[in-house]
C-alpha cells in the first residue's frame, strides 16, 4: 500500500470527519446511503489506521455525536454484516502519524485542533481496546466468511453492547467532558467556552437517550425472533442493560427536534427522560452569566482524568470467536446458502 502523501491522507480523514459531522441516525437502513458509502471508501484506503481514525472521531467535539449515532446504528440494525465497517482492510498502515494528520485536517476544516473530549482513564482504555480489537475481529473473508456471518454477528453485537454500556457509565457525570476548555480571560473566549460546554453536554445527553431507546426497541423486536442470531443478540442486550428493571436510566434531556426521529413509545419498561436541572443553558443565559461573572476561567479537568489522545495501545479481543455455540449454522436458509445478497446483509467488503 505504501505511505500516503499528506494531501491524500488529509483528504481521507477530511471525508471521515465531515461524514460524522453530518451523520443521521438510521443511515445504515438506507440503501445507497452516501454517508455509509463514504465511510466504506475511507476504510478501504487507510488500512490499519482505521481504528485510530475512528478513535479521533469519537473524541473530537465536531464528530463525537455522529460517531456515536454510527455505533448505535450498527448495534441495532437488522443488517447482520454492518459490523464489518469497524474492521480494517489489509495489513499495512499508510500513515506515518495518524494523530498529526488528524490535527492538520482539523485546521484544514477550520476546526480547533485541541477540542478533544477528555474521558476517564478507564473508558479511554476500554474504547481504544474495543476499536483495536474490532479492527481485526470484524473482518469477514468474502469467499468463506459469509457462510458464518450470523455467528460473528452475535459476538460483535455483544462486544458493541459492552462498548455502549461503558460509554453510558462513563458519561453519568458529563462535567468531565468539558475539561478541554481552556479560555483566556476575555469575555468572548469565556462565552465561547461556555457555549461549547452546553453543546457537548446536550450531545452526550442525547446519545445516552438514543442508546436506551434504540436498545429497548431492538429487544422488543427480536427477543422472540425465529432467527437465533437476532434472538441471541436481544438476550445479550437484555442481560447487559437490565431494561426490565429500568437500569441504566437516561439522564434528563432537553426537548429537541431531531432528524433521526428517536423511537416513539419504546415500551413500558424503557427508561424515561425529562427536562431537569441538568438541562443545558441557552445562549442568552450563558451570555448574561459571562457578563456578570467575576470568576476566572473554568477549573481544569481533575488530575484523575487523562487525555483521550493518550489512549494506551492495547490489542486484545473482548470475546473469543472459538466459543461459538454448536448448531448455529443449521438455521441458514437456502437463500442464504445459495444466493447471498451482500447489500441486504450490509456487508462491507474487506478487500
Swiss-Prot record:
Q: Where is the composition biased (Basic and acidic residues)?
A: 285-297
Cite the residue spans of the region called Disordered. Answer: 245-310
Q: Which domain of life is it from?
A: Viruses
Tell me where it resides.
Answer: Virion; Host cytoplasm
Q: Hey, which family's this protein in?
A: Belongs to the phytoreovirus minor outer capsid protein P9 family.
Function of the protein = Minor outer capsid protein.
Name it: Minor outer capsid protein P9
Q: Write down the species.
A: Rice dwarf virus (isolate Akita)
Amino acid at each position: 500500500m505504501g505511505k500516503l502523501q499528506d494531501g491524500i491522507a488529509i483528504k481521507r480523514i477530511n471525508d471521515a470527519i465531515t461524514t460524522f459531522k453530518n451523520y443521521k441516525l438510521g443511515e445504515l437502513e438506507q440503501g445507497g446511503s452516501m454517508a455509509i458509502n463514504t465511510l466504506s471508501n475511507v476504510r478501504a484506503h487507510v488500512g490499519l489506521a482505521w481504528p485510530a481514525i475512528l478513535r479521533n472521531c469519537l473524541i473530537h467535539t465536531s464528530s463525537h455525536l455522529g460517531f456515536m449515532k454510527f455505533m448505535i446504528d450498527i448495534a441495532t440494525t437488522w443488517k447482520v454484516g454492518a459490523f464489518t465497517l469497524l474492521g480494517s482492510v489489509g495489513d499495512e498502515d499508510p500513515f506515518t502519524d495518524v494523530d498529526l494528520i488528524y490535527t492538520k485536517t482539523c485546521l484544514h476544516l477550520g476546526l480547533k485542533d485541541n477540542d478533544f473530549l477528555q474521558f476517564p482513564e478507564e473508558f479511554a482504555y476500554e474504547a481504544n481496546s474495543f476499536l483495536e480489537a474490532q479492527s481485526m475481529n470484524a473482518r469477514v473473508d468474502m469467499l468463506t466468511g459469509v457462510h458464518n456471518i450470523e455467528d460473528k454477528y452475535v459476538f460483535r453485537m455483544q462486544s458493541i453492547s459492552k462498548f455502549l454500556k461503558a460509554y453510558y457509565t462513563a458519561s453519568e457525570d458529563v462535567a468531565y467532558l468539558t475539561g478541554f476548555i481552556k479560555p483566556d480571560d476575555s469575555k468572548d473566549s469565556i462565552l465561547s467556552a461556555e457555549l461549547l460546554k452546553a453543546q457537548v453536554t446536550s450531545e452526550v445527553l442525547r446519545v445516552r437517550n438514543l442508546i436506551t431507546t434504540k436498545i429497548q426497541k431492538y429487544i422488543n423486536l427480536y427477543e422472540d425472533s425465529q432467527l437465533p442470531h437476532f434472538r441471541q443478540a436481544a438476550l445479550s442486550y437484555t442481560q447487559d442493560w437490565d431494561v426490565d428493571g429500568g437500569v441504566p436510566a437516561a439522564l434528563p434531556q432537553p426537548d429537541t427536534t431531531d432528524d433521526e426521529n428517536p423511537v416513539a413509545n419504546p415500551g413500558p419498561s424503557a427508561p424515561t427522560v425529562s427536562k431537569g436541572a441538568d438541562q443545558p443553558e441557552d445562549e442568552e443565559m450563558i451570555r448574561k452569566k459571562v457578563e456578570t461573572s467575576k470568576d476566572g476561567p473554568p477549573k481544569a479537568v481533575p488530575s484523575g482524568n487523562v487525555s483521550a489522545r493518550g489512549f494506551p495501545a492495547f490489542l486484545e479481543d473482548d470475546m473469543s470467536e472459538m466459543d461459538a455455540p454448536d448448531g448455529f449454522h443449521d438455521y441458514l436458509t437456502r437463500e442464504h446458502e445459495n444466493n447471498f445478497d451482500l447489500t441486504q446483509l450490509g456487508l462491507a467488503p474487506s478487500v
